[in-house]
Amino acid sequence: MMDPIHQFNIETIFTIGHIGGQEIAFTNSSAYMLVAVVLTSLLMLATGRKLVPGRMQSIAEISYEFVADTIHTTAGKDGMKFFPFVFTIFMLVTVSNLVGIVPYTFTISSHIIVTAALAFLVFFTVLIYGFYKNGLRFFKLFVPSGIPIVILPLVVAIEVISFLSRPVSHSVRLFANMLAGHITLKVFASFVTMLGAMGIVGVFGAVLPLALVVALTALELLVAFLQAYVFTILTCIYINDAIHPGH
């Protein structure tokens, strides 16, 4: 059976240079990040503004309205200033997840370093804007109202730990789901290949694994959208905390 982890290997395409003895390389991960950006840009540029929208325009409009509604629902009118930021994250995660389902491609969201970078970007955006807008009142985020004074220190400590752990949970959720799904697909696809190579008997035996591969691929499509949605709505919730701490 082929190694199911091999698909996640980061391989150097060409070396850009060295800084402090550290190689700076353009990798397959970098290439598929670029692919995700290009595909997203083409989707936005090729839509047009027809009165009767075509498929591409409909996809772009649905994506736009979905993100706008999500921000407005979770963060209110003030949250709309973050629309470009949230929309960019949503489209990047969605497109990269979908590209990764195509055989022999690379799933950038299956690497913790990528999801962690996005999660920390959200975390520091919330932190910086929270203090910029609210000053020291941002600390109200850690002091829930209506808590008895006796247990307040414990609650504050829990809230601080919860806040600091956000980048971890935010990144691991996306990374783990994409990693597990693609490993499962690879394992069953390998079964199909192995059984198919055994002749006519093996071909019949490969029917069930093949059916599972088709079903799992459909499930992965759902997971690709679902994880992009979860990552986006958590981003909006965290932004709401920066805008309205203590609410």
From Swiss-Prot:
Compartment list: Cell inner membrane
One short Pfam name that applies is ATP-synt_A
Record field: transmembrane:
24-44, 82-102, 112-132, 141-161, 194-214, 219-239
> What keywords are assigned to this protein?
ATP synthesis, Cell inner membrane, Cell membrane, CF(0), Hydrogen ion transport, Ion transport, Membrane, Transmembrane, Transmembrane helix, Transport
Question: Which Gene Ontology terms cover its molecular function?
Answer: proton-transporting ATP synthase activity, rotational mechanism
Q: How does it sit in the membrane?
A: Multi-pass membrane protein
Question: Main location per UniProt?
Answer: membrane
Q: Name one GO cellular component term.
A: proton-transporting ATP synthase complex
- Kindly give the PROSITE patterns that the UniProt entry links to this protein: ATPASE_A
Q: Which InterPro entries match?
A: ATP_synth_F0_asu (IPR000568), ATP_synth_F0_asu_AS (IPR023011), ATP_synth_F0_asu_bact/mt (IPR045083), F0_ATP_A_sf (IPR035908)
UniProt superkingdom: Bacteria
* PANTHER family linked to this entry: ATP SYNTHASE SUBUNIT A
Quaternary structure and partners = F-type ATPases have 2 components, CF(1) - the catalytic core - and CF(0) - the membrane proton channel. CF(1) has five subunits: alpha(3), beta(3), gamma(1), delta(1), epsilon(1). CF(0) has three main subunits: a(1), b(2) and c(9-12). The alpha and beta chains form an alternating ring which encloses part of the gamma chain. CF(1) is attached to CF(0) by a central stalk formed by the gamma and epsilon chains, while a peripheral stalk is formed by the delta and b chains.
Family classification: Belongs to the ATPase A chain family.
Please give the function described in this protein's UniProt entry: Key component of the proton channel; it plays a direct role in the translocation of protons across the membrane.
Please state what the protein is called.
Answer: ATP synthase subunit a
